[in-house]
A protein has these predicted regions:
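Bacterial N-terminal signal peptides
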Residues: 10-19
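C-terminal motif of bacterial Sec signal peptides marking the signal peptidase cleavage site
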Residues: 21-23
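Glycine-rich, small/hydroxylated-residue low-complexity segments
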Residues: 25-484
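Positively charged n-region of N-terminal signal peptides that target proteins for export
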Residues: 1-4
């Protein structure tokens, strides 16, 4: 019996030793409750300059997520943003923005200092810009404005890969540093939003209340960025990467795409409707990337829209002008060399740094010197401007536009052509002649312009050509003839 007792006691002693020895000399980690994690997050966000968030414990919901992270939901938080607390480079007063949100969801890992914005429900932002703009304009010696307000509301928004971790360590950072941190964290992210409204109000010179309201049923955005290049514009001490190597890699520095559906715009004066418009669908993309040969950079945008309709009660001619079934527009600035882009980025970076120091005279001198470098590299690049509209389907007919000009030197206009193709010209002119909504003056003016400047071929198609030539600088040609 004694032997059995001592054996059991020995086993128990060894077991306790194995449990206790690894923890000797260590402090026991405090495990926080879910609600304490949420409260700590709110407290940390309140340390962001200008940001104030209040949320009652009963309105906080904490759920487990993947990778031992938390899903933290704040219901009906009270949020205020004071722009005057941000380092904008100008003195700002009365710049508080009130933000109401029904629900905001974060994904959070306090150990990794990670914070992601997941979704927002029922947002309302209200801002009286009068004080902000007046102060900003007065700093530039201009007269202030009155009665300027903006309201932004949104039914919901869902975010994918939107990392806002820089807010967890923003207490001592200025705006430019935060922008750089956000760019570094968000090389690629997506947003899907519904029921968005932008309401801009202001007083006209005659003290009439003007209201411009933009409603968007659905909107999606996608952004991809090569952060190493863009971050260097905002972060102090961060050098630009070798842009020649960036060209060889063939990766876009910035690629932004946005699409919207059921877009409505209305303009009112003293609550009386001046005009409105609708677009069934629109898509916009903005890019800055290497060309197909990886030899030069291209900067530009694309814009497509379907079914634009305007309603202007007191001007039927504007309604007709805005009756567009379909339009596709492209613009690009091409042949941009790596040295030119570097000189431009150097100027942007220097402007950011000098703006923060408020040494305006020194900034101006630096800009003048760097501007000469930019001009020199610009001409060495021999950049080309390209613009096109196709398709363009209007109430009266169709047309296509092609523009291609190249800068060869600073002392002469760019060389190239702008061509407008108009199929079935006579059919369009017949429709214009019979349009009762047009005034006699407008109708006769359009018919006269077409007859005078639109040559028509044997197939009934018209072509208008404007050009400049390298061998005749300073002379402009319309349809092959010099313009006198």
């Amino acid at each position: 019996m004694k032997r059995h007792f001592f054996l059991s006691a020995s086993i128990l002693s060894v077991s306790l030793a194995l449990l206790l020895i690894p923890n000797c000399g260590k402090h026991r980690e405090t495990v926080k409750t879910d609600m304490e994690v949420a409260a700590d997050l709110v407290q940390t966000l309140n340390e962001v300059p200008g940001l104030s968030i209040k949320s009652e414990p009963g309105n906080m919901i904490v759920e487990p997520s993947e990778k031992n992270r938390y899903l933290i939901t704040l219901k009906d938080p009270a949020i205020d943003l004071d722009i005057s607390k941000l380092n904008l480079g100008i003195p700002v007063k009365n710049a508080k923005i009130s933000i109401k949100i029904k629900e905001i969801v974060f994904k959070h890992d306090p150990r990794e200092k990670y914070l992601e914005l997941v979704s927002i429900r029922e947002l309302l932002l209200e801002w009286d810009l009068t004080g902000f703009l007046s102060t900003a304009l007065q700093a530039k010696g201009k007269q202030g404005l009155q009665g300027i307000t903006i309201k932004i509301s949104m039914g919901k928004a869902d975010f994918k890969n939107y990392d806002i971790s820089p807010l967890l360590d923003a207490k001592t950072k200025d705006l430019m540093e935060l922008v750089g941190d956000f760019l570094e964290r968000n090389q690629s992210h997506e947003t899907a939003a519904e029921h968005i409204t932008y309401d801009l109000g202001f007083l006209s010179k005659e003290h009439k209340k003007i209201s411009i309201v933009l409603d968007i049923e659905k909107m999606q955005t996608r952004q991809n960025a090569l952060s190493d290049v863009l971050i260097s514009l905002y972060k102090k001490g961060r050098e630009l990467p070798d842009l020649s190597k960036v060209l060889v890699q063939g990766k876009a520095l910035l690629d932004l795409a946005m699409s919207s559906s059921a877009v409505k715009l209305s303009v009112k004066e003293n609550e009386n409707l001046l005009g409105s418009g609708t677009i069934d669908h629109t898509a916009f993309s903005y890019f800055f990337k290497p060309d197909e040969t990886n030899s030069f950079f291209i900067y530009g945008f694309k814009w497509n829209m379907e079914n634009l309709k305007l309603s202007v009660p007191n001007n039927k001619e504007i309604e007709l002008a805005g009756n567009i079934e379909q339009m596709g527009m492209k613009f690009s600035l091409e042949n941009l060399s790596a040295p030119f882009i570097k000189s431009y980025f150097d100027l942007v970076k220097k402007s950011h740094e000098m703006s923060a120091s408020m040494d305006k005279e020194k900034l101006h001198q630096e800009q003048m010197t760097m501007g000469l470098t930019i001009a020199s590299e610009f001409i060495k690049s021999k950049p080309a401007v390209k613009f096109s509209i196709s398709p363009f389907k209007h109430h009266f007919g169709e047309l296509q536009v092609e523009v291609n000009f190249q800068f060869l030197n600073l002392m002469a206009p760019p060389v190239g052509k702008a061509v407008v193709h108009i199929p079935a010209v006579n059919k369009i002119l017949t429709k214009i002649a019979g349009e009762k909504s047009l005034s006699d003056k407008t109708r006769e003016g359009l018919l006269k312009l077409a007859k005078q400047y639109v040559p028509v071929d044997e197939n009934g198609n018209g072509t208008v050509t404007f050009e400049t030539r390298q061998d005749q600088p300073g002379t402009f040609f319309l349809n092959g003839k010099p313009i006198k």
